[in-house]
């Protein structure tokens, strides 16, 4: 029986490399997968998943009006698994579509993304995945400043912490830092 999985972690926790690894493992066995990602993430072009270690792969871009259930239903061949990158950027209706893919089409869905933003608030997609997922798993990494587990994302601008602003600002290592709670509130930026 298929399930909806939500695997979340902070920046630099290896979420995208995990997607690429899972896809590779399925495909090595001759089992087709569908990789999807939010069209909001434009760092490496719309419709691509790419890891910080340099691996990159084309994916179906999810726009605000994308009908995920309809898209999967209309594929010529039923996939063995659906893999979603940047799931935090999904809209409520996308997450409900993913649940229907699992329940109605019996296709497992693995969604990967951030749980909370730089203000330590849930993203829309994360909120609904936490509500609907059959299994929730944290992908762990460590704080950039100490050896504690990173649970938060610190946004920086020219080396200074930022706690206010638009929720979504696309950026990478130059903008976002994985940190523990202590260093979220008292970042060690200059050390």
From Swiss-Prot:
EC class name: transferase
Catalytic residues as annotated in Swiss-Prot or TrEMBL: 86
Where does it mainly reside?
cytoplasm
* Any one of the GO CC terms: cytosol
| EC identifiers of the protein | 2.7.1.21
Which domain of life does this protein belong to?
Bacteria
InterPro entries in UniProt: P-loop_NTPase, Thymidine_kinase, Thymidine_kinase_CS
Q: What does the record give as the reaction this protein catalyses?
A: thymidine + ATP = dTMP + ADP + H(+)
The biological process GO terms on file are: DNA biosynthetic process; thymidine metabolic process
Instruction: Please tell me where Zn(2+) binds in this chain.
Output: 143, 146, 180, 183
What NCBIfam families does the database record attribute to this sequence? Answer: PRK04296.1-4, PRK04296.1-5
* Protein name, per record: Thymidine kinase
- Report the source organism: Streptococcus gordonii (strain Challis / ATCC 35105 / BCRC 15272 / CH1 / DL1 / V288)
**What would be the name of the gene that encodes this protein?**
tdk
């Amino acid at each position: 029986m298929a399930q909806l999985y939500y695997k979340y972690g902070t920046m630099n926790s290896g979420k995208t490399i995990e997607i690429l690894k899972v896809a590779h493992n399925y495909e090595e066995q001759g089992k087709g997968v569908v990789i999807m990602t939010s069209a909001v993430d434009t760092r490496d072009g719309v419709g691509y998943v790419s890891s910080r270690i340099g691996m990159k792969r084309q994916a179906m871009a999810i726009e605000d009006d994308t009908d995920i259930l309809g898209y999967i239903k209309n594929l010529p061949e039923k996939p063995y698994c659906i893999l979603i990158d940047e799931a935090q950027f999904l809209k409520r209706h996308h997450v409900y579509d993913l649940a229907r893919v699992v329940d109605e089409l019996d296709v497992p869905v693995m969604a990967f993304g951030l749980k909370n933003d730089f203000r330590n608030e849930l993203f829309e997609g994360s909120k609904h995945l936490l509500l609907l997922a059959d299994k929730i798993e944290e992908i762990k990494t460590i704080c950039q400043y100490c050896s504690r587990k990173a649970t938060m994302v610190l946004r920086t601008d020219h080396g200074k912490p930022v706690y206010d602003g638009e929720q979504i600002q696309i950026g990478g290592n130059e903008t976002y830092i994985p940190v523990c709670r202590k260093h979220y509130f008292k970042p060690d930026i200059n050390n």
